[in-house]
């Protein structure tokens, strides 16, 4: 790693070396370079816990799997219950978080999954993780505030964050300013109606805890495969909670072939 960091230092300026040291290799703490000498030091205030044990299978946007619940656990130094005072008055929250499972460099153009993974568009016209500052923004539904001995917890639903993703900030969703029903979504518009038919035989489905069945089916409906992979003969696999789920996709139908308990 020392040789790699040394080569980066020789190729790019001092500001960018800070980016690679703190973001790419140590994503849990971050120093972002915002401009000419302007620095913002951020660190996680919380981590999210859920059944998305790997990025393969995580919904591509928040709200696509509303039945999946997650727990937000606050870090030491951010467990003061006063920080959550009156938060229960809001139905939805914004989460500012880091792409902790993204080890790639940012790119000026990216290939959105819903364009087949072939057409390139500008990174700022997408929600791709390959961004100059590796930050994500998601709207989740606040289900419950739990008082626990080790600090308050937030139970949320509809998150598109992998398990143990660092959260840097939490803000209330304000429908009178944040909602724009007449907004135009460009090439992302067809995603709203996209869903696969899921064939899940009773024998295999019975291996899944009943409380997790609907959530898993919803995840599969939105096609967890990488956009560039479309081989009907290939058996794909993804991990969800304590299970390995294997499946094939033909046209608009996803068929679960195996379920293994981890």
Segments from the language model and where they lie:
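Cationic, low-complexity basic patches in intrinsically disordered or flexible, solvent-exposed regions
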Residues: 2-3, 25
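Arg/Lys-rich, positively charged N-terminal/basic patches that mediate binding to nucleic acids
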Residues: 31, 37-81, 87-89, 173-218, ...
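Active-site-adjacent substructure of cysteine-protease-like catalytic cores
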Residues: 38, 83, 87-136, 228-230
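Short, conserved beta-turn/loop elements at beta-strand boundaries and strand-helix junctions
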Residues: 53, 145-151
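Short solvent-exposed strand/turn elements
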Residues: 150-173, 260-262
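A conserved acidic, glycine/proline-rich C-terminal tail/linker
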Residues: 213-239
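Enriched for short, Lys/Arg-rich terminal
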Residues: 250-262
């Amino acid at each position: 790693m020392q040789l790699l960091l040394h080569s980066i230092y020789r190729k790019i300026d001092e500001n960018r070396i800070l980016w690679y040291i703190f973001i790419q290799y140590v994503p849990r703490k971050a120093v972002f370079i915002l401009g000419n000498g302007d620095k913002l030091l951020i660190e996680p205030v919380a981590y999210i816990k859920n059944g998305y044990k790997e990025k393969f299978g995580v919904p591509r946007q928040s709200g696509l799997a509303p039945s999946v619940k997650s727990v937000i656990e606050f870090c030491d130094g951010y467990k003061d219950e006063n920080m959550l005072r009156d938060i229960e008055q809001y139905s939805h929250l914004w989460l500012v978080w880091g792409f902790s499972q993204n080890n790639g460099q940012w790119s000026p153009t990216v290939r959105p999954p819903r364009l087949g993974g072939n057409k390139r568009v500008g990174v700022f016209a997408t929600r791709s993780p390959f961004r100059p500052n590796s930050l994500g923004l998601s709207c989740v539904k606040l289900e419950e505030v739990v008082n626990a001995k080790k600090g308050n917890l937030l139970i949320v639903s509809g998150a598109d964050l992998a398990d143990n993703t660092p959260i840097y900030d939490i803000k209330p969703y304000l429908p009178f300013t944040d909602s724009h029903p007449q907004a135009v979504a460009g090439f992302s518009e067809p995603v709203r109606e996209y869903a696969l038919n899921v064939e899940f035989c009773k024998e295999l489905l019975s291996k899944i805890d009943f409380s997790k069945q609907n959530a898993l089916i919803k995840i599969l409906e939105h096609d967890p495969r990488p956009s560039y992979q479309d081989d009907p003969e290939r058996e794909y696999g993804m991990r969800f909670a304590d299970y390995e789920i294997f499946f094939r996709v033909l046209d608009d139908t996803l068929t679960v072939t195996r379920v293994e308990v981890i």
